[in-house]
C-alpha cells in the first residue's frame, strides 16, 4: 500500500473545540500518565490541499519504564469503539491522525504513527503536539507529518517534519464563545472564577445590536439627506439583511422571545446538573475500593 506524503502547501484548519478537548483530556488524565493521547477526526478535500480538524477523543494508554526502555501500549479496542460511536453521530468525520501533550515528540511517536497509518488508509496521519505547560502564557501547538526516508533497498525510517501552516478556524458560535472568553480574561468580574450570568450576556449582545442599528440608521439618514454618497454594495447588504428577518407583529415577537428565554434557562439548569453529576462521579472514582 502506497502512502502519499503531505505537501508543504497543505493548509490545516483547527477548530478551537479540539484544543479544549485536549486540555480537558490532559487535566483528567490518570495520575500515573505523563501525557494525554487521543485520535484526531476531521475532513479533507479530494486534492488534499485543505484539511480541517473538527473533533477528537481520548484514547486510554499505559506507559511503563523498564530500565532504559520505555514501553507504550495503546488501548486499540477502546479507540475502535469510540470511533464507531462517533460515526453514528458524525459519519462525515474520518480519522486523520492523533494528538499528544508535551513539549517535544515522545519516543512513542513512531509506534503511534504505525497504528494510525493503518487507521487513516492511504493517507499519512497528522500528529498534533500540544504543550499544555503554557510557557510564556501561551498554548503552543505544533503539527507534524512523518516523511519516509532511507537508502533504497536498505533500512527505512521516519522523519517528523513540521507542517508550516496551522490555522485556527473560528466561525459562528465558536467565534462568539471565544470573544466572550477573551473579554472575561481582559476584564474579569469581581467574583473571580465565575462567568457572568447568561442573561447578562443577552443584555450585552442586545446593547451591541442597538449600537449597530444606530450606526446603520445614521448611514441611511446621511444618504437620504445627501451628506454621504450611496454605496450599492452596502445597500444590497442591508436589503439582504432586512429581507432575511421574518415580519412579525409585536405580540408574536414577544411570545417567541419569551419561549427562547425559557428554553435557555432550562438548558442552563440541565447543564448545571450534568456538571455537578460529573464532578461527583470524578471524585467518587478516586475513592479506594473496600
Swiss-Prot record:
Keyword S-adenosyl-L-methionine: no
PANTHER family named among the record's database cross-references: EUKARYOTIC TRANSLATION INITIATION FACTOR 3 SUBUNIT F, EUKARYOTIC TRANSLATION INITIATION FACTOR 3 SUBUNIT F-RELATED
The MPN domain, residue ranges: 12-150
Assigned protein family: Belongs to the eIF-3 subunit F family.
Gene: eIF3f2
Pfam families: JAB, MitMem_reg
Example GO molecular function: translation initiation factor activity
Record-annotated membrane-spanning stretches: none
Cellular component terms (Gene Ontology): eukaryotic 43S preinitiation complex; eukaryotic 48S preinitiation complex; eukaryotic translation initiation factor 3 complex, eIF3m
Main localisation: cytoplasm
Source organism, top-level taxon: Eukaryota
Subunit structure as annotated in this protein's UniProt entry: Component of the eukaryotic translation initiation factor 3 (eIF-3) complex. The eIF-3 complex interacts with pix.
Role summary: Component of the eukaryotic translation initiation factor 3 (eIF-3) complex, which is involved in protein synthesis of a specialized repertoire of mRNAs and, together with other initiation factors, stimulates binding of mRNA and methionyl-tRNAi to the 40S ribosome. The eIF-3 complex specifically targets and initiates translation of a subset of mRNAs involved in cell proliferation.
Subcellular location: Cytoplasm
HAMAP family: eIF3f
GO biological process annotation, one example: formation of cytoplasmic translation initiation complex
The entry's keywords: Cytoplasm, Initiation factor, Protein biosynthesis
Name under which the protein is recorded: Eukaryotic translation initiation factor 3 subunit F-2
Organism: Drosophila mojavensis (Fruit fly)
Amino acid at each position: 500500500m502506497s502512502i502519499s506524503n503531505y505537501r508543504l502547501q497543505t493548509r490545516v484548519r483547527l477548530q478551537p473545540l479540539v484544543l479544549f478537548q485536549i486540555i480537558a483530556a490532559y487535566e483528567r488524565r490518570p495520575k500515573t500518565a505523563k501525557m494525554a493521547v487521543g485520535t484526531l477526526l476531521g475532513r479533507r478535500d479530494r486534492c488534499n490541499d485543505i484539511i480541517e480538524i473538527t473533533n477528537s477523543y481520548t484514547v486510554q494508554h499505559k506507559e511503563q519504564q523498564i530500565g532504559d526502555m520505555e514501553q507504550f501500549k495503546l488501548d486499540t479496542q477502546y479507540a475502535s469503539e469510540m470511533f464507531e460511536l462517533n460515526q453514528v453521530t458524525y459519519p462525515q468525520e474520518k480519522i486523520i491522525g492523533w494528538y499528544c501533550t508535551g513539549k517535544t515528540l515522545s519516543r512513542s511517536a513512531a509506534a503511534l504513527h504505525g497504528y494510525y497509518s493503518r487507521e487513516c488508509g492511504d493517507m499519512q496521519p497528522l500528529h498534533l503536539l500540544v504543550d499544555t505547560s503554557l510557557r510564556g502564557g501561551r498554548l503552543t501547538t505544533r503539527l507534524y507529518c512523518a516523511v519516509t526516508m532511507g537508502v533504497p533497498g536498505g533500512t527505512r525510517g521516519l522523519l517528523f517534519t513540521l507542517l508550516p501552516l496551522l490555522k485556527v478556524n473560528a466561525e459562528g458560535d465558536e467565534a462568539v464563545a471565544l470573544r466572550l472568553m477573551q473579554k472575561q480574561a481582559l476584564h474579569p468580574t469581581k467574583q473571580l472564577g465565575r462567568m457572568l450570568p447568561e442573561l447578562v450576556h443577552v443584555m450585552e449582545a442586545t446593547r451591541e445590536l442597538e449600537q449597530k442599528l444606530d450606526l446603520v440608521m445614521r448611514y441611511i439618514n446621511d444618504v437620504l439627506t445627501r451628506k454621504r454618497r450611496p454605496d450599492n454594495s452596502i445597500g444590497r447588504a442591508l436589503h439582504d439583511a432586512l429581507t432575511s428577518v421574518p415580519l412579525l407583529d409585536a405580540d408574536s415577537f414577544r411570545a417567541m422571545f419569551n419561549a427562547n428565554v425559557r428554553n435557555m434557562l432550562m438548558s442552563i439548569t440541565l447543564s448545571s446538573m450534568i456538571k455537578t453529576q460529573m464532578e461527583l462521579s470524578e471524585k467518587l472514582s478516586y475513592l479506594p475500593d473496600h
